[in-house]
Amino acid sequence: MPVYLPPISRRRFIKGSLAASALVAAGGCASHTSASDPNSWALLSDIHIAADPNTVHNNVNMTRNLRMVAEEVVAWPEPVSGVLINGDLAFNSGDLADYAAILGLLRPMREHGLPIHLALGNHDHREHFWATLPEEKSADASLPERQTALVRTPHANWFVLDSLIATLQTPGRLGDAQRAWLTRALDANQDKPALIAVHHHPDLNLVHVPALEDTAALLEILRPRRHVKAWFFGHTHRWSVFHDESGLCLVNFPPVAYLFEDGQPNGWVHATLRSDGARLELRCLDHARKDHGQVENLVWRV
């Protein structure tokens, strides 16, 4: 199922189906699009877009925030090779009109030549999302009810997972079939660092927000496979970077949309991938914040 929006400029070559292109689909994979810096990525989460662009929640206009981020991404001095949005695309319950609005707001980045990789969160609705993008559906039915993807880059492979249980059900779960797919995919791709992207955070008593229910089962897969270097997540509407007991990097993306607690930033993260780690730069919507431009230099475990 679709997790990938191609650059608009390439659509004339696709002819209604992405199956023959660099589609990232359920159980499938794709290479990064050509760009001046293939290791440069824009990482977003929790955009929470409503059909009505004037919708405000927690004193935040989500449409305005995403527009601001998109403008900054396309103007980035080292052009990014791709965009990852790590779940909670829709405002509340994933209405069809929400996804139509999201496509419109993402269009400037796609017209700039950027592919956009999408994960789903607990505020999303799979069937409504797929209905909005009928021509993007893949014929690959290896995981027909989930959105999983392998995205290859020169220095690392992204494994994008789907933790949505049901719309408006706050916790997340991967399930047996998806974890089995991930195990096979990781074992078949040990040549580069593996980076896990999933909307829900690990259940490690980080915050008082329902987490990924099968955290323990996922960590049993990730921790012993030393080529797995990091777990990137959203959901908590917080920004943090730390390591677990095995040396696995745990990166919590800030929300593009609203905050759950005062003092946290909203914005996005610019990532520069290396063979031995990654440089993460926090890009706050409020450029006056002290942590705007904060850099975290990650070094992968060995």
Residue spans for each PLM region:
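N-terminal secretory signal peptides
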Residues: 1-9
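Active-site neighborhood of phospho(di)ester-bond hydrolases with catalytic His/Asp-centered motifs
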Residues: 44-45, 83-87, 116-121, 161, ...
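Catalytic metal-binding/acid-base residues of hydrolase active sites
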Residues: 19, 48, 90, 123-125, ...
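Short acidic, glycine-rich surface-loop motifs adjacent to enzyme active sites
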Residues: 189-206
